A protein has these predicted regions:
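Alpha-helical DNA-contacting segments of helix-turn-helix folds
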Residues: 159-160, 164-166, 191-216, 242, ...
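Alpha-helical bundle regulatory/interaction domains
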Residues: 1-162, 166-175, 181-185, 199, ...
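Flexible, glycine/small-residue-enriched loop-and-beta-strand segment within the central core
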Residues: 220
Length: 269
């Protein structure tokens, strides 16, 4: 299975959107894969499809009825199994941390488990995005998707959260972040979870995992020893333990079996 991941052409969108991909019902067979924790906020728009989400599995199939639906995925701490009983029409958008807030006002109210299977922040959101399925050419679909997103765009700054995210990107400890920003660890954690939908420790662990993937993919780290110290782990056993907690696989087994989708990684079953 080949899925092309597109990055936005708009400089405004590139600041907040990592990218997007399309799937359709033309040809293809049932398939399934595992996707692994990340810090993106992922929105999928589906046409004429049914979606059932459980704690560690999402099952998609063609619907007997004509309909469109949107789903939201922003928090899973272990591999998520995604099963396509039949191919479906789908557009999936990867928003960067705090990115989706620039397109959906009051996004915090949707960062609850109940929002994942049915994400309808406002009437035009689903209808405008699902209208892209009626466009035949991929290049025109991409242009229209960017137009729709720019139509939703309204910048919402949060300098405090930006500072937290920047420090996490530099792998600064939670204790040190609270000291630098002169707030309690409790307030820091509560504020972060309200805005991002996951705990600081979850985010930090996932960020280390994603950096490991990028280092191996880019060739910057040539073995697991280099990968351990590039990610500021004390030793390889600590690195392997954290890695297995996220993937359910050892690093060696994971890199042997996984397949890259540009900015994400899947394990095809």
């Amino acid at each position: 299975m080949s899925v092309k991941f597109y990055q936005p052409k708009s400089s405004i969108l590139r600041k907040y959107v990592e990218g997007f991909y399309f799937m359709n019902t033309d040809g293809g067979q049932p398939f399934e894969y595992y996707t692994f924790p990340n810090n993106f906020c992922i929105v999928s728009v589906l046409r004429n499809a049914d979606l059932v989400i459980s704690q560690d599995e999402a099952v998609l199939s063609r619907s007997l009825f004509s309909k469109e639906l949107c789903s939201l995925t922003y928090r899973y701490r272990t591999p998520l199994r995604v099963v396509y009983k039949e191919p479906v029409d789908e557009i999936t958008i990867y928003f960067k941390p705090f990115g989706i807030h620039q397109f959906v006002k009051g996004m915090e109210r949707f960062l609850t488990p109940e929002s994942t299977a049915s994400f309808d922040p406002f009437p035009e959101f689903r209808s405008h995005l699902s209208g892209i399925f009626d466009i035949g050419e991929r290049t025109e679909q991409i242009c229209r998707l960017e137009e729709v997103l720019l139509g939703f765009f309204e910048e919402r700054k949060d300098l405090f959260l930006d500072e937290i995210l920047s420090l996490l990107e530099d792998d600064v400890s939670v204790e040190e972040i609270s000291r630098q920003l002169n707030v309690s660890r409790q307030y820091l954690g509560q504020y972060f979870k309200l805005k991002i939908g996951k705990t600081l420790s979850e985010y930090r662990l996932t960020e280390r995992f994603r950096k490991s993937l990028q280092l191996m993919k880019s060739g910057s780290a040539h073995n697991f020893t280099e990968l351990t110290y590039e990610n500021l782990y004390f030793d390889q056993s600590h690195f392997s333990k954290d890695f297995k907690a996220i993937t359910n696989l050892s690093p060696k087994e994971f890199f042997r079996r996984a397949q890259w989708l540009d900015h994400n990684v899947w394990l095809i079953v």
